[in-house]
Regions:
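Active-site acidic Asp-centered loop
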Residues: 4-6, 54, 61-63
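Active-site donor/metal-binding and catalytic loop motifs
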Residues: 171-178
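Hydrophobic targeting segments
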Residues: 1-4, 29-30
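A conserved acidic beta->alpha catalytic loop
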Residues: 5-18, 35-37, 65
């Protein structure tokens, strides 16, 4: 498990350090720093982790998702031979204010339903909260640098996968975004 933070002052850093210390048998590391890869801060932050990863599988997950213990199993469960990427729209939970409630209403009604319907029709598209890749697919399309050529990495991910004749699939259960 590779955790990435752009700055040591990131609010998640103390939690990640505690998790690593509490689970010494799990191979994990925290990488801090920013590489100017593109105009996308998320990709700039993830680049060091992408370079450090040695697995054939890569999962890019936003830090504001609540992940169940079977997160990776759920992503793998929908993988097929013609899959290039597995993603999942988030479910908005626990809004703290009016604008949080608006975000939850959007995520949990229009956005999630359209995305799930598209997936059922074989036209699934990525949501940047969860991007589960086979490394060879991402690298064949130009790697993280290719994702940075578009404003949104999820749109670029969908295009990269489809350009290779592969499909984006969605996890069968969504993940909470408080």
């Amino acid at each position: 498990v590779i955790f990435c933070a752009a700055r040591d002052s990131d609010a998640a850093v103390p939690l990640v350090r505690r998790l690593i210390a509490d689970h010494p048998k799990v191979r994990s590391q925290l990488l801090i720093g920013d590489t100017r890869l593109s105009g996308n801060p998320k990709l700039n932050n993830l680049f060091k982790g992408y370079e450090a990863a040695t697995s054939d599988w890569l999962v890019m997950t936003d830090s504001n998702l609540l992940l169940d213990r079977d997160y990776l199993r759920r992503l793998m469960a929908v993988w097929r031979e013609d899959t290039g990427l597995v993603s999942a729209p988030p479910v908005g939970t626990r809004p703290a204010n009016f604008w949080g409630a608006v975000e939850c209403a959007f995520l949990n009604s229009s956005q999630a339903r359209w995305q799930l319907a598209a997936d059922e029709l074989g036209q699934g598209f990525a949501q940047g909260k969860t991007l589960f890749w086979r490394r060879e697919v991402l690298e064949a399309g130009g790697g993280l640098a290719a994702l940075g050529r578009k404003l949104a990495e999820d749109v670029a991910s969908t295009r990269l996968v489809r350009a290779q004749g592969l499909r984006v699939r969605l996890a069968q259960r969504l993940f909470a975004q408080p």
